[in-house]
Amino acid sequence: MLDINAFLVEKGGDPEIIKASQKKRGDSVELVDEIIAEYKEWVKLRFDLDEHNKKLNSVQKEIGKRFKAKEDAKDLIAEKEKLSNEKKEIIEKEAEADKNLRSKINQVGNIVHESVVDSQDEENNELVRTWTPENYKKPEQIAAATGAPAKLSHHEVLLRLDGYDPERGVRIVGHRGYFLRNYGVFLNQALINYGLSFLSSKGYVPLQAPVMMNKEVMAKTAQLSQFDEELYKVIDGEDEKYLIATSEQPISAYHAGEWFESPAEQLPVRYAGYSSCFRREAGSHGKDAWGIFRVHAFEKIEQFVLTEPEKSWEEFDRMIGCSEEFYQSLGLPYRVVGIVSGELNNAAAKKYDLEAWFPFQQEYKELVSCSNCTDYQSRNLEIRCGIKQQNQQEKKYVHCLNSTLSATERTICCILENYQKEDGLVIPEVLRKYIPGEPEFIPYIKELPKNTTSVKKAKGKN
């Protein structure tokens, strides 16, 4: 959330900056004025509460004097009761006003960084850079790693390897259900182990996160729309929890309420988060329906960093650089794009996506999102840094950044399309030592069903 002082001119804030940011996001500008008005109403209630406390103290003293003098104090006792009832009403109104004010502030997004493209259309995402393996020029439907024709979609390659079973998965789980089998399991575990080893070698602390969170904690790190579109709820009697959509959520709360008093020595803190993740994908009906690219349950390796505010943009570049190095080591062509202002989630001041090339589908698809959330999350979670200096008016919060390293099922999909051959799959060299037998190649062992995706695509061209 933003600091309330940022909305108030009298506190050194500039509401016009927030309004301009809201406009870039395509969100409500009027909300800023509503927050300012509600803050003033809350201040008035606080003033009324203070005044009632003063009056109550004064009346209580007078009652004491009357009792001491053995004089009648019925009128003062009646006045005290009246003031106490009024105070109770004011406390209730103040609590409700505070709740409503915080709720509205939480609806306002982070201040969009000046370098972000101002647009509501993701077609205007900024192309930052591209990378391809040496001697690969992205010819039509050619697998990047093997040079063979990319005749099959990722899910068809996995079917021919007997690497997953979607039919039984759907029968048991429902929409987008699946079982990984055989080398599907080994590939997934290889990516998990390689990803953790990769980040560990760069100084990240591996952290396996819990997959459920209390509602009150989740509310501090996930925005309201995620509760409706993304998160699964788990209810046990009156106990209400949410399954995580990313390990960023529990890891962001890992240091909640803590204070890094010596930031130069204690920060940055870098975590390599690992967890299973769960997403309803409520707004993605019919999108990426093939295979295991977009599913309800998956595994993910996440970068999460806490840093000093002055160093967060340097850390942002470092984190996207780590993800790029990871995909370069896998030999997967990709591009990095800067996300337009209208597509940023509330917490992000700026976001880069890494989109890898899928040769069968002839398109780039998102594998990584890297965001600098500045102090938007840490303010809600009260993660502070530095020793408060004399005359310092504002609290200083750490900056929080997150970046996917690998959502492993998605990464597998990209490997399957780029490492396929006519008779099987070449295993990326960096993954081989994590797979039993350290195979260089896995042959196909199953035939595809009739009228599968590649057949339909071929018919469509004829």
From Swiss-Prot:
It holds the Pfam family Seryl_tRNA_N. GO terms for biological process: cytoplasmic translation; seryl-tRNA aminoacylation. It is found in: Cytoplasm, Cytosol. GO terms for cellular component: cytoplasm; cytosol. It comes from the Eukaryota. Keywords: Aminoacyl-tRNA synthetase, ATP-binding, Cytoplasm, Ligase, Nucleotide-binding, Protein biosynthesis. Its EC number is 6.1.1.11. Its main location: cytoplasm. Belongs to the class-II aminoacyl-tRNA synthetase family. Type-1 seryl-tRNA synthetase subfamily. Consists of two distinct domains, a catalytic core and a N-terminal extension that is involved in tRNA binding. This is Serine--tRNA ligase, cytoplasmic. It comes from Candida albicans (strain SC5314 / ATCC MYA-2876). The lineage of its organism: Eukaryota, Fungi, Dikarya, Ascomycota, Saccharomycotina.
